[in-house]
Amino acid sequence: MYRAITMRVEPRSDQRRFLDESIRVHHYVYNAMITAVKLYFSYYGKLPSHNGLNRVCTQIWQNNPWMHRIYQNTMNQAAKRALDAFRSCNPGIKQVSRKKKDGNVAGALVLRSPRYKKLERSNTFGYISNKSFKVVDSVDNKGKNRRSLSLGKMKGSLRCYNQSTPIREEPKTVIISRKDLGTHCEYFATIQYE
């Protein structure tokens, strides 16, 4: 059974730029994945596999050098979210192809599409592999517990505010979210563990 703990994190200014850039790139990749699924479905008449969309994410990352500052494997979460959005909009469509008797795919199925996200509504990104992040628990000079979160390709570690709640097992994923409060933004990390 998966459990989750959410805690507020306090990034420095360079870390804040990294988190904002990661959210912006994930917004771009999510919208690109919606277009990729539409094109794949119009050509093959079925939804693509998750691994197929991950390969498209890799191609996007390789073709855009401005994305190389973020961790590439986190883009796979955007592909998974786009595929899940298509599956929730089209619950009757399986991943198998449905062609007409003459072999033509056109007109066999109608695909309902999720909406493209605006940048203002994109507020999360995630590390879906525990090899790309690390939760560090330590004790300071005064004997207090200190928890910090290190993310792949980000310099330094994020200070976590929820120090006392124990994480009993090995963390599996972490989702970073941003909440706009008008005058400033607050950042939260949700750590999922088994």
Give the positions of each predicted feature.
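Nucleic-acid substrate recognition interfaces
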Residues: 1-194
